[in-house]
Amino acid sequence: MSKSENLYSAARELLPGGVNSPVRAFTGVGGTPLFIEKADGAYLYDVDGKAYIDYVGSWGPMVLGHNHPAIRNAVIEAAERGLSFGAPTEMEVKMAQLVTELVPTMDMVRMVNSGTEATMSAIRLARGFTGRDKIIKFEGCYHGHADCLLVKAGSGALTLGQPNSPGVPADFAKHTLTCTYNDLASVRAAFEQYPQEIACIIVEPVAGNMNCVPPQPEFLPGLRALCDEFGTLLIIDEVMTGFRVALAGAQDYYGVVPDLTCLGKIIGGGMPVGAFGGRRDVMDALAPTGPVYQAGTLSGNPIAMAAGFACLNEVAQPGVHETLDELTTRLAEGLLEAAEEAGTPLVVNHVGGMFGIFFTDAESVTCYQDVMACDVERFKRFFHMMLDEGVYLAPSAFEAGFMSVAHSMEDINNTIDAARRVFAKL
């Protein structure tokens, strides 16, 4: 047995499923998950000594690559002064100044510890500010594991939400309306049925939890217009897209102004950080200035703030996003060329530094139904064959891939060459 197999066997006796987050267990692709010993730049190194070109990037945060010296040094320096104080620090102020400068729609920001905390708190704030209970989310979009968001669509577009996890009471889910991503008609229908009851829409501007599905040109502007028409807040969940699709996020890339923005992943530089913020009048409703409660023992802790501050300063340097786009575009085009040579039907979506691979005969993938029609079994085989080639992709057909500026063009070309060999055998 390999070291990974031995560790996984031991882990399953101690951790549910042997992991601390479900997708890591390889249940979406089968087999034994890799246990990682270290990472550097664009590479992961497992406990058995094998190196992999990494396109998971810790599920998004590692836009600069692993073990970046600026972030590492910032964490070490901060740790020498203390790990957490439970009191305000100068770095919190500097971090807030930087975030609001980089994302101009955020007049104010509240730091939290995860993307789930950010979305959960933003929704509570929207409900408190508007005095309304219902929210709209989209089928196939994921916004963390808060109860009101673990909801699937009912039997029709306008049915009340149903829990999609045991432990979520139906009374929680009934206030969540699930519409079809990239389908404005379904959203308008929800507003027409509940014109005075919807507090907010929450949306991934690029859906990254049904692989990678960009918005149609009219979709995000249409959501903004509907929110304005019905007095509803628009929450853009940039946990995945923030600082990756563009420096000011997908909202800037697509030219849409939200009322609230949720951030995570890159904002922490690899440390557990989330944030939400937006319009000053809305944020003023948050405790202690307003009645909507939110708190956290480690929110804004000095280690996470130091890591995030160092990361964002590097990400804001000229050329970073041009490099991400160039590398991701080359990878997408190369994969399509290699698939075509082998007669393998493939769609590759990509925006900025994120991409999605779909095995499908369809010409495009634009919504959850398109994603569900893809060949998951073929993806599973592709994943394991690429792993054997030393390429680490997301171990699920429903998760986006992530590029970093640490990837070289040689890494990209080697990945394409590996895919060419794999497509020939699929």
From Swiss-Prot:
The gene is hemL. GO terms for biological process: protoporphyrinogen IX biosynthetic process. One of its GO terms (cellular component) is cytoplasm. Belongs to the class-III pyridoxal-phosphate-dependent aminotransferase family. HemL subfamily. This is Glutamate-1-semialdehyde 2,1-aminomutase. It is an enzyme of class 5 (isomerase). It catalyses: (S)-4-amino-5-oxopentanoate = 5-aminolevulinate. Pathway: Porphyrin-containing compound metabolism; protoporphyrin-IX biosynthesis; 5-aminolevulinate from L-glutamyl-tRNA(Glu): step 2/2. Its EC number is 5.4.3.8. Its cofactor is pyridoxal 5'-phosphate. It is found in: Cytoplasm. It comes from Shigella boydii serotype 18 (strain CDC 3083-94 / BS512). GO terms for molecular function: glutamate-1-semialdehyde 2,1-aminomutase activity; pyridoxal phosphate binding; transaminase activity. InterPro entries: 4pyrrol_synth_GluAld_NH2Trfase, Aminotrans_3, Aminotrans_3_PPA_site, PyrdxlP-dep_Trfase, PyrdxlP-dep_Trfase_major, PyrdxlP-dep_Trfase_small. The modification N6-(pyridoxal phosphate)lysine is found at residue 265. It comes from the Bacteria.
